[in-house]
Amino acid sequence: GIRVEAAPLSNPLPRSEGIPFAKYAARMPTFLNQFEGCWVGDAMPFSGSRSRRLNMWVRHQCDMSYYPAEKIIAIADMPPPVLLCHYDKPFVPASSVSWGLEFIVDPADVKGEWFYLDFDLDAAADGYTQQSGRIYEESGRLCALSRQCMAYFEQ
């Protein structure tokens, strides 16, 4: 039958130009300690950026090779609301309302440790924000799609 492969990632921002999570650990949620990674591009949470896009390279701190689906699920669930980039001071409480994840490839076929996350802010108003994300393995192959609605609580 007909088969159409997902478009690969083109020209990802290099890890070497990123800002390591550890550099801003005091401003970030503690669960990020479970991951090694860096923010790339012009936005990161609480940076005051008006960007609608959040990009990062990320991998688990521990070996997840025996848990291929869980490895991708945790990676896909770790990005904060893109809207938090618009704020210049922590903390703005936020919580998931709904989340969906679609695997594009069988998780067992994903062999790398590093993932490139490309998340877009679709809309935000009245305490709700929607975002879409693409999770790529280091080779550039699209692994999964994420869709999330979150509530945020301005003080």
Residue ranges and their predicted role:
Residues 1-155:
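Terminal targeting signals and extreme-terminal segments of soluble enzymes
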